[in-house]
Amino acid sequence: MRALMNVWEPHEVSAELLAMQNIELQQQVVEKGIVAIEGEGGQLWKGDITRLKVDAIVNAANAQGLGCWAPLHNCIDNCIHSAAGIQLRKECNDQLQGRLLKTGEAIMTKGYNLPAKHVIHTVGPIIDTNIPTKEQEGQLAQCYRSCLNLAEQAGLESIAFCCISTGVFHFPNERAAEIAIETVRNYPRQSVKTIIFNVFLDKDYDIYHRFLSEGSPAAATDC
């Protein structure tokens, strides 16, 4: 089913088909297990972001904003769309109407079959060399601000960030973590109380853990 979802064109489908899909995806939620993060401030969690029960998870999207079209690809964009259901691509398409997302921009959708209430989709910079430019560093910081702007406008209280741009977009992991933590720390939050830095790789966990617990110049223990 997932492979078919990944190549599905965003158009209306029958209620019966949606119901069948939703039953299957909700069963997958039960099998994977739902993770609820307690407490406020900045927190680090390693695991599958599609398990998190928060107000919003952040998706590292591409400029088209419609998810990954490669069947069964393991990028976070594909994983989130596959777990949410075909409704997610439809809503993204309805919002964008063929327009491309700018680097640093974000849009927010419902979470559908995810434990998260919403998905915030943002496009990070693509790095062609090992060293990002100052402009690209600024674009990555803008991704985090754009996501927080949408969360604040909607009155959300919790948000989980993936490691934006560090996957197939090749942003250096350590510098990306510094920018993420610094941007979140300096953002004037009001409604958002809990920010989760979600990582999937051991090396990202080690980087974030070090910055958050050992006093990196760009980090705060409590974001």
Task: Name each model feature, range by range.
Residues 1-223:
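Macrodomain-like recognition of ADP-ribose-binding/processing modules
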